A protein has these predicted regions:
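A general secondary-structure signal for short beta-strands and their flanking turns/coil
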Residues: 2-4, 55, 76
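Acidic, proline/glycine-rich low-complexity IDRs
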Residues: 68-98
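Short, intrinsically disordered low-complexity segments
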Residues: 28-66
């Protein structure tokens, strides 16, 4: 399946910290590069990266039925965020903001 999830975590949170927090909740995590991490659970796989200006980006694949769960999880961790779920044509079909 092609990537269907993209988003931003506000506040310039380091990708390693995002991965560490998700790991403590049972997600499988690993370093993807010098500046990015990957996190995976049975219903979602994301890459977490940080741009030169400090914006924390996420993108990956999620079971569309779980986007609310991911948004609630990020909110519970205190992360302001925006998430976009796209269909197979790349059109945004759902958005979540906290």
């Amino acid at each position: 399946m092609a990537n269907n999830l993209c988003g931003i975590i506000e506040g310039g949170i380091d990708p390693d910290l995002v991965a560490s927090r998700l790991s403590s909740l049972g997600w499988k995590t690993e370093s993807a590069s010098w500046s990015s991490s990957e996190a995976e659970t049975r219903w979602c796989r994301i890459e977490i990266d940080q741009t030169d200006d400090g914006t924390t980006l996420i993108n990956g694949v999620i079971d569309p039925q779980q986007i609310d769960d991911l948004s609630r999880l990020f909110a519970r961790l205190g992360w302001q965020h925006s998430l976009e779920l796209s269909d197979e044509n790349g059109s945004v079909v759902q958005e979540r903001r906290y």
